Amino acid sequence: MTASPDYLVVLFGITAGATGAKLGSDEKELILLLWKVVDLANKKVGQLHEVLVRPDQLELTEDCKEETKIDAENLSSAPQLDQALRQFNQSVSNELNIGVGTSFCLCTDGQLHIRQILHPEASKKNVLLPECFYSFFDLRKEFKKCCPGSPDIDKLDVAAMTESLNFEKSDSVSRYGASQVEDMGNIILAMISEPYNHRFSDPERVNYKFESGTCKMELIDDSTVVRARGLPWQSSDQDIARFFKGLNIAKGGAALCLNAQGRRNGEALVRFVSEEHRDLALQRHKHHMGTRYIEVYKATGEDFLKIAGGTSNEVAQFLSKENQVIVRMRGLPFTATAEEVVAFFGQHCPITGGKEGILFVTYPDGRPTGDAFVLFACEEYAQNALRKHKELLGKRYIELFRSTAAEVQQVLNRFSSAPLIPLPTPPIIPVLPQQFVPPTNVRDCIRLRGLPYAATIEDILDFLGEFSTDIRTHGVHMVLNHQGRPSGDAFIQMKSTDRAFMAAQKYHKKTMKDRYVEVFQCSAEEMNFVLMGGTLNRNGLSPPPCKLPCLSPPSYTFPAPTAVIPTEAAIYQPSLLLNPRALQPSTAYYPAGTQLFMNYTAYYPSPPGSPNSLGYFPTAANLSSVPPQPGTVVRMQGLAYNTGVKEILNFFQGYQYATEDGLVHTNDQARTLPKEWVCI
């Protein structure tokens, strides 16, 4: 609770575009600023002041011209934004005769005038706003506190407030903007008088700057997160904060997303302090950052934690010094040392803390990845460092990029939590032989490319028309990207090569929801490669990460056991057993033994009906096995992530279970819950 100001300055802004609830959503510039001073102590209202503002683009919408009676000729000789703000500041200072102990605060009709007009436009034009624009009273919220029985805030405009107070509409001022300021002054006088006696004591705040920091695995409200898409590759968290200037982003709440190769994919997740600020951020959909327009969509707290959460001790220690500028180095020699990095930047851009300000990225086995993060104390040092982009360190040129705390976490988490590829040992979990595996050279599948992201399986069936009856059971496979979202691709398994060929010929480049879709004939092998994370292009097949050569490939094989289905398993439904889905090579799970590390980037999350790519090795089509000891496999779902072997065995206390070697941890990327397999 802060002290009530001596004066309120009622402020109202008009842009060259939309008005009312859509004010500022069309990115139009400010053209008129109106204000009036209210003396709270003496309960007096001052004179109306206004100043025209010349925008960079002298184009006004027809609605704006009709409401404001302003045209381009009036604006051609008007002052620009910085000059208009100086006039405003000078006028208020002269009228209030501000001295020691005198205070005033702005008061607006809602949040839009300050958060969606003045701050974003001033940021784009590099105009420094006066101190008074970083705190203001929202008259709608104050009126709701004063009159709890009034309409909801989203419906509470100036007209609704005057109606609630039973004011007679004044005909003395009829111009748009001027009439609103006149009514707001009268509303304030009524609120501070009997019987309300309202005190203006808790103003809204606008953050001066974005605070970087780490994000812990805490509960995040889904209604506070947005996804920004289409960002320039070199953009940083500070650029994102500047795009959302005027809205309060939570500390460390701007997280840049990385693709499967660890490079930025042009997306970011942004967490705001409240749902109100998130909703205002959504109104900036397709606003511009430089020459690029940025798409803004709703996201979830889970999405944000996947990108920015899970800070390790190493990362937390590195980022413990706040307000540091982070630069990412890429392409370092694997033998590079901290001393060489310090010498690379030199005296003109000293690293914060010397060697302590450098964080090398390594694989889980300690091998360097060629990446590192460096801290600089100020923007000037960081800019000097970025000028060394593509300079040589040893015999390799080094790429330098502005980075963020969230990117440090992502990169470290990505490499430190890479999946471990176990050496093949005799399988212990029965895998039933599949009923049918198509020859890899039979082109009885089709690939759909360029699907709308919102396309469903039903949309695909409608798109294929008569050929939808020729699709095999569970034969539609949607390809997801590394974030679990549709990639625009899908594979369809047809009943014959002829029908696949005819479908590809007939529907190639036909439209689905205003987008033309490319249809190609392909084989089951090509489909499996893509669904497991590989790429299919004109140059042929690029294998998925799990198909890449291991660092130390095993040099031995195991005898194939006889394919037998245990009688104990016959009482269970097929869905409860590890039965591979149709049209997928037979697979077998292996226990965790001696581990190898794979150069891991990311996998496509497998959609239902698609082959999974984690936790097992492809084996020969006729290979299947049973546990070496009699028993039955029981599947457990919904386990907590920190559940260990001891907790599972305690759960089965009283039953005779196999040794701990008979318990296999699996991690299904297509699921959000862990599961365990126990041999009893």
UniProtKB/Swiss-Prot annotation:
The gene is Esrp1. Residues 224-301, 325-405, 444-524 form the RRM domain. This is Epithelial splicing regulatory protein 1. One of its GO terms (molecular function) is mRNA binding. Belongs to the ESRP family. mRNA splicing factor that regulates the formation of epithelial cell-specific isoforms. Specifically regulates the expression of FGFR2-IIIb, an epithelial cell-specific isoform of FGFR2. Also regulates the splicing of CD44, CTNND1, ENAH, 3 transcripts that undergo changes in splicing during the epithelial-to-mesenchymal transition (EMT). Acts by directly binding specific sequences in mRNAs. Binds the GU-rich sequence motifs in the ISE/ISS-3, a cis-element regulatory region present in the mRNA of FGFR2. One of its GO terms (biological process) is regulation of inner ear auditory receptor cell fate specification. GO terms for cellular component: nucleus. Epithelial cell-specific. Epithelial-specific expression in diverse tissues and organs with particularly notable levels of expression in skin and gastrointestinal epithelia. SUPFAM superfamilies: Ribonuclease H-like, RNA-binding domain, RBD. Its main location: nucleus. The modification Phosphoserine is found at S542. The keyword Electron transport does not apply. PROSITE patterns: RRM. Disruption phenotype: Homozygous knockout mice die soon after birth due to complications from cleft-lip and palate defects. Knockout embryos show alterations in inner ear morphogenesis and auditory hair cell differentiation. The modification Omega-N-methylarginine is found at R581. It comes from the Eukaryota. It is found in: Nucleus. PANTHER family: HETEROGENEOUS NUCLEAR RIBONUCLEOPROTEIN-RELATED. The keyword RNA-binding applies. Keywords: Methylation, mRNA processing, mRNA splicing, Nucleus, Phosphoprotein, Repeat, RNA-binding.
